[in-house]
Amino acid sequence: MKADNILQTIGNTPHVRINRLFGDQHHVWIKSERSNPGGSIKDRIALAMIEAAEQSGALKPGSTIIEPTSGNTGVGLAMVAAVKGYKLILVM
């Protein structure tokens, strides 16, 4: 996969078949969200939150985002904000 920026890789995570756990009678697949660039499914929500705010007009170029977080959502927001040029303040 080639991407123009890291945000294009969010959500393009592999599907992996679980072969031995359930035998041949069931076909179980998992989506490996840890393969997102920030290492978490929270990359998806961070991108969705920022893009929704942009589309609604609530977030404009040069804006500062302030978000309470103590985990992976903050990592995702930091990555998306950096690529899109927003300042980000994370608080607990």
What residue ranges belong to the model's regions?
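PLP-dependent amino-acid enzyme catalytic core
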Residues: 1-92
